Amino acid sequence: MTFRIPSSQESSNKSEKDTTVNSPNASSFSSFFKKSSQTYLSKRSEKLNEHNSKLKSSGSFTSNSQTDLSNSPSSKKKNIFYPIARAKHSFYFNHNWSSDLQQANSPVASYSSQSVSNDSNFPKDVTSPISTDLSGSNPSLKSPSSINSAKLRASRSFFRFPKWSRKSWNPDVNSTTSSPSEVGSLDKAGGPLNQQNENLSAESDNTILQNGTRKSSVKMSDLGKRIASLPVVKRPPIQFSISSDYIKPVDKSDQTSNVPSPSSSVGSLRLYRSPSIPNDVEQPQPQSSRSRPRSSTIPTQRTLERLRENRSSIFSFRTLRRDDDECVAQTIENSALFSDIKPNPTKFLSSVPELTADDTAESYLSKLRETVPYSRMIPVLAEKDHVTLNKALHLCMSGMEFENRPLDFCLRLFLLKSHLPKETQQIDRVINAFSKRYFECNPGMFSSQDQCYILVFSLMMLHTDVFNSNNKHKMTKQEFINLCDIDELAPEIMEYYYDNITFTPFVNLDDELLLIEKEKNEKYNFTSRKRLGLSPYTFTLENQLNISRPEISLSYDGKFISPGIKDIASLLNVRKLISSPAIIQLVSKRSHPMAFSNHFIGLPDNADPGLVDFSISMLGILPRCEKKRRSVGHNSYKEHLVLLTASRILFFRNLVWAKDLMAQKKAYERRYKNFTTTSSSFDTLQGIDTEAMEYEFPKIPPLVFTPPLEEFSPDTSYSLVNAFAYCDRDKKNVRNCSFTVIFRDGSEETLCAPTEESMIEWVAKINYISTLRTAGLRMPVSDSYHPKRDFSCYPKYMEEELAAIEAQMKQDMEIARARTIKTRIDQLETSITEFNKKLMVLQRNAKNLSTCAPLQPKTRVVILQALKKVDAKAQSLYLEIRKMESQLQVLRFESDLDKCISLESSNDIDDRPSSTSPSTLKNPSINSINRQTHDVEKESSDRDVPHLLDPDNNFNLKGNPENPSSTFFTPEILSPKVYSDNVKDEPVEDIFGFEDTSESSPGKPSQLRLQIEAFDDELADTASLGSVTTCLDQWQTFSDDTDSGFALNLYSSEDFRTDPYKEHDEFSMNSLSKWHSATSDN
């Protein structure tokens, strides 16, 4: 309680006023507040007395003074009294207030006019009625001066809070709201004050207040006693409370009445004591607030509006929203998704039909549709675990279309049309039926129906966890990802589901339509209801899911093809082309093989250096793609000379030397363009007995490029081990007839062929060489390329023994080759199965990610990044599978072809004469294989061979499949015309070197030439191979023998004897030449 000393003018013009003293009958404040009130009043009294004594001594304080202490500078400086500033935070109860305080709307009591004597700062007779909110007994004050000299502030009073934030001190009583005019201050006492009598009259003692107490006028000396003598009543445990429910306004017009009026001014409210109100007085009834319903999975629409108040969408849905009067009902009328339901299905049309023994799932569902709304059908069908009800539930779910829709959107659509049952087992049946239907509509998104069920159940639990207000600990995104660690699903998919589910709660159509109908009857409209803003449902109802989906297509069917080898006939053609390569001669200065021949006389250093043959399976000048870092999306092409060897692919930038090689190749092809491998054409051109010369001379000599090279250093070189060449049909920014080669280190090279036939030949040869090199098999070499064994230095009785040894070696190598092919085929089949499983997992993740429709920008970025990663992994796996399928197909054709050759060879051996001289050993004719081609193809078709090429693809090598030997060379168009006029036709006899003895003749190969194969490291030490002079490993020193005095060592080391098919890359260059020389003579 607070007191203020009025001025003398106020005492003369204003009358004495009374205020009611509402003594609380229950103690609601603690003893701490009582003690603090006494201490506060005593200190204020001492300060005022000290200040007034100073003013009195200076003569400025008299009885006629009109100075207001509250406005004096000294009082403000010493923080004695700040009524305006403190009224903003708490309420004061004073005797009187100035006009400026009343304009500030301070809830204070009326001023009391009294005179101040010169002898004392306080009058002897003062009426100080006090209006307080104390609910306990007031403490006894020490002196009346302490009451007049201080001003009590209601610390931590509930009046400091606005009406909307006030809470009852008793949690068992519901507080009601009141208008702003009802809040703020205490009520005036009834009846006007006596303005003539300065002393309080005894007539006011008989005035009865509304709450049953008397309005008393006492002197200041008796005020403390009266307050201390107030009765103390215990507060009832439930009903008593000091709250805003018991603050009532007082009518200003009728001051004699104690009936509250809502038209009272601010600062005139009365505080009642709730336990002591008489029965004849109407007690305000508190408004009962609606109790919060039980937490459910689908909240009310009001909750949705509060949750969506400050939430923004990624697209703001400007293109999807219509006018301000849009509602869900309008969208439903224009949507085909709700054609099976009626608007506002709020009540059952009749009772639920009973399930009889004669009812089937279809009949019971039809009866249920006639009596029960669609939204209530799902709880009825899931009520019991019955076979017919379960079938009817799945039949009801079958009417929903979930194709190519995200799982979270389908779940929202289902719950928008249907209600969930209350029990857990019933909810489980509904989720099971929903997951089964979604799995049927999207078969490639999940590995099983159980996986889909687990994900749907997790989304339902996540929604309940997030939007349940009673749950204090919400699940975080990382916790959801860790808990829902479903096998084979990417974590980005779980992150997407978390963001979309927590974006907005689920909505049911019945609740939405009822809310719309209710708001039509309301007198006010919420501004937030002008636009619904249900972003996921707007997407679903208007079928606009493609707006938020990432535009990335992951389809590889028919995209990568590797043409050229589709049957045994095409494989045979590629094999013949590779077995007759061109030759580049390299000069080896470290070896002088002629010095060790029988015809050389002189020092070894004076002998001519040796020459090493470097086989070239294919060559050409091809534009090579060079990617630039600065220019994105634009690739430049530069011409390079490309050489394809038996183990590597080489790139040269020296186009001058490249044009020289291409000119020699063109002249060679023009010279022998009319030659074939058939004996009839050979007989016509030569007129020679081919029976005697069939295996003595080559039918077509190899192409030997001149002059020999002293240096051979390519600009770029790649190993063909585990390489793969393919054509990308959908690749952008590439030229026509282009193909790509992927090497084992992951690097790629894109080349452009001049024609489509040339492109097919390049792809077929690269894949064939890569298959053999990866499996560790020898490259096929024509018999004309094998150096001929000279038996003139051996005795005649040793010829049969050497021929028998050679035949046994050939048979052993054929067995080892067949065993190696079979082992490699088994490895490829196992690898293809494993890689297919990994590819299926990536395809499921890619389909899930491409179906997602994120609602937030951050989620969309995550989905795009995840799609790019999955795309890169899937493309790499797909190319790896295509490469293994290509190798598997080549090896199977190779195995079948070897069986045909072995069978033909055995037939030739049976017809062979008893003499086993090397001149009578025959190799199987290629033409004889054509008789068994039909049987081999039939046998290979029975096997489950992976389909490598596109069915519509007719790519094949140039030639007749019926007679693959009819075409031996494929002419190259890309060749310079500068050298064509200088080449002259030579006679036929010069082809085989009968008359021409010049050493530079391309048709006369060197007698010291050695056929070698290029391995990974052959370019590092190529010249060392020139020391080998024969087809055997090496000639050992002849030692004395008891019989003949000669001995021949056919094996150079024990390693070759035990394992002649050791991995080639592990050999050094010295052992490489030995291995090839020992195994090349078949």
UniProtKB/Swiss-Prot annotation:
A biological process (GO) of this protein is:
intracellular protein transport
State where composition is biased (Low complexity).
Answer: 27-37, 105-121, 134-149, 257-268, 283-301
**Which InterPro entries does the UniProt record give?**
PH-like_dom_sf (IPR011993), PH_domain (IPR001849), Sec7_C_sf (IPR023394), Sec7_dom (IPR000904), Sec7_dom_sf (IPR035999)
This protein's record includes keyword Transport:
yes
Q: Does the keyword Transmembrane helix apply?
A: no
- Composition bias of kind Basic and acidic residues appears in 43-53, 932-950
Q: Which UniProt keywords apply?
A: Protein transport, Transport
Protein's name in the database: Protein transport protein sec73
The organism's lineage is: Eukaryota, Fungi, Dikarya, Ascomycota, Taphrinomycotina
Name of the gene this protein is made from: sec73
